[in-house]
Curated annotation (Swiss-Prot):
The active site is at residues 136, 164. Pyruvate binds at residues 49, 207. GO terms for molecular function: 2-dehydro-3-deoxy-phosphogluconate aldolase activity; 4-hydroxy-tetrahydrodipicolinate synthase activity. Pathway: Amino-acid biosynthesis; L-lysine biosynthesis via DAP pathway; (S)-tetrahydrodipicolinate from L-aspartate: step 3/4. The record marks 48, 110 as: Part of a proton relay during catalysis. The gene is dapA. It comes from Haloarcula marismortui (strain ATCC 43049 / DSM 3752 / JCM 8966 / VKM B-1809). This is 4-hydroxy-tetrahydrodipicolinate synthase. InterPro entries: Aldolase_TIM, DapA, DapA-like, Schiff_base-form_aldolases_CS. Pfam families: DHDPS (PF00701).
Length: 306
């Protein structure tokens, strides 16, 4: 199994599209290189932020391959989850063959399995594909919560190495961290506004939407917290707070794609049924981004000990 350190910042990448809906691979590669140059610890293509639900299986793997080809040393964690275990297994195997360093596996959605169903699903994938795997719990999207007992049982599998927490429940997240501390197991934030609170109780980093827009600041915040400088981490957290909130005023990735367009990082085109950011939120997003641009702190953040 490939070794990977699940500490730090892992941007959940967007999949850029041309106006006709085809994938803009040139922009995708440029974006991967921009984020790697900013100092992130890994890249996560074809997850929820990457609109994986609208990609064919072949497109899914083509995006993974393009990101891998674009970067030098940064690990690539491919989203390969599904609500169909057989389909998740196919995507996971193909992602591994494409050269992915690890897999991000959203819990089965819509069909709402019971806890034993989660255990069976993830164990099947972990037994079959010899890559580090991240269990992803986001009940607001999937309709079902992965409970702490289930997370703790899954953490004992040698290929299940991390848990992405986006439940919004700090008591639950804290319990999972407590119960897996003796395992070689990482707990990552999947909610930018919860990243610093999670780091304060033993979380190891984040799979972040906002890091697409502010990678240096996000790396500085996480790096400061991991090194014990919570005063600095807190200051950056509050500096980024308006961005964290702006990224979720509408369904992800609608706001982040608009922010990418405003910053000149790529187009805001989305695949149906997602639609462009509404005018009522667009002006506020511009204001948030303009405020962040008033201070040129990139060099300071890039030099922060991480």
């Amino acid at each position: 199994m490939t070794a990977i350190d699940f500490h730090g910042v892992f941007p959940a990448m967007c999949t850029p599209f041309h106006q006709d809906g085809s994938i803009d691979f040139e922009t995708l590669r440029d974006d991967a290189q921009r984020l790697e140059s900013a100092g992130v610890d890994g890249l996560v293509p074809v997850g929820s932020t990457g609109e994986s639900a609208t990609l064919s299986h072949d497109e899914h793997i083509e995006v993974v391959e393009a990101v891998i080809d674009a970067v030098d040393d940064v690990p690539v964690i491919a989203g390969s989850g599904s609500n169909n275990t057989k389909e998740a297994l196919e995507l996971s195997r193909r992602s591994a063959e494409a050269g992915a360093d690890a897999l991000l596996l959203i819990s089965p959605y819509y069909n709402k399995p019971e806890q034993q169903g989660f255990i069976d699903h993830y164990t099947t994938l972990a037994d079959a594909v010899d890559l580090p795997q991240i269990v992803y719990n986001v009940p607001s999207r999937t309709g079902q919560n992965i409970e702490p007992d289930t997370a703790a049982e899954l953490a004992s599998h040698p290929n299940i190495r991390a848990y992405k927490a986006a439940s919004g429940d700090m008591n639950q997240i804290s319990e999972i961290i407590e119960r897996t501390r003796d395992e070689d197991f990482a707990v990552l934030s999947g909610d930018d506004g919860m990243t610093l609170p999670m780091l304060s109780v033993g979380g190891t980093g984040c799979i972040s939407v906002s890091a697409n827009i502010e990678p240096e600041r996000t790396c500085a915040m996480v790096g400061a917290a991991l090194s014990g400088d919570f005063e600095r981490a807190q200051a950056i957290h509050h500096e980024l707070g308006p961005l964290f909130r702006a990224m979720f005023v509408e369904t992800n990735p609608i706001p982040v794609k608009e922010a990418m367009r405003i910053r000149g990082y790529g187009p805001a085109h989305l695949r149906s049924p997602l639609t462009r950011l509404s005018d009522e939120h667009l002006d506020h997003l511009r204001d948030v981004l303009a405020t962040l641009e008033t201070e040129d702190l990139e060099d300071e953040y890039a030099e922060a000990e991480r």
